[in-house]
């Protein structure tokens, strides 16, 4: 077994904007691209989401892609660098038509703390913390809940992720049963919130065998 069975500690986060007439082709290409990435060392899981509501309603990204990583070191392995050089990059139909925002993020906190192996939930709520004190406060609150909670919320995972050059992001993976709880915690934050639906969710073969 080449990968650890520990909980992933990093996320490669990609927000994507592109014209609607390219969505079907883009999705088909992405499915294959995700599977290519999942054979690389340190890549544990690939997910892609479609935007449904909220956030930047004037110009929201249509898709989010997130790779769960052992650590950010996975983005600097010889295998990853070589794959990036040899993969050929974007297909011709996307060149000049796509805009991507990339963030290489560490996981600052998670609830539950041992959320791996993951639940395959269909919904994602994402909100940005525009105040460092909010991020620290939420992180401390999550630590307290992790220590004192008798039972986890079913099909629910909350993570705070952050990179060096932008605001922290809170990822809330859930199914319909947790929607009311999420409404409460996101409304209290006063932050920018968006909702997403999962359209791709696969793990690396090593993660599935662990």
Regions found by a protein language model. Name each.
Residues 1-210:
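Macromolecular interaction modules
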């Amino acid at each position: 077994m080449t990968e650890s069975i520990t909980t992933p500690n990093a996320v490669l986060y990609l927000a994507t904007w592109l014209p609607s007439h390219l969505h079907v082709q883009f999705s088909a290409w992405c499915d294959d691209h995700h599977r290519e990435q999942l054979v690389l060392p340190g890549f544990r899981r690939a997910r892609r989401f479609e935007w449904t509501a909220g956030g930047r309603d004037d110009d929201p990204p249509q898709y989010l892609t997130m790779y769960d990583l052992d650590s950010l070191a996975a983005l600097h392995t010889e295998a990853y660098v070589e794959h990036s050089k040899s993969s050929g990059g974007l297909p011709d139909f996307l060149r000049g038509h796509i805009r991507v925002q990339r963030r290489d993020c560490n996981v600052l906190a998670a609830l539950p703390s041992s959320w791996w192996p993951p639940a395959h939930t269909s919904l994602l709520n994402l909100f940005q913390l525009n105040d460092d004190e909010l991020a620290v406060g939420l992180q401390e609150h999550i630590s307290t809940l992790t220590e004192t909670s008798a039972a986890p919320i079913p099909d629910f995972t909350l993570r705070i992720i952050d990179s060096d050059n932008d605001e922290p992001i809170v990822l809330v993976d859930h199914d319909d049963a947790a929607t009311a709880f999420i409404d409460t915690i996101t409304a209290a934050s006063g932050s920018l919130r968006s909702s997403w639906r999962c359209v791709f969710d696969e793990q690396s073969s090593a993660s599935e065998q662990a």
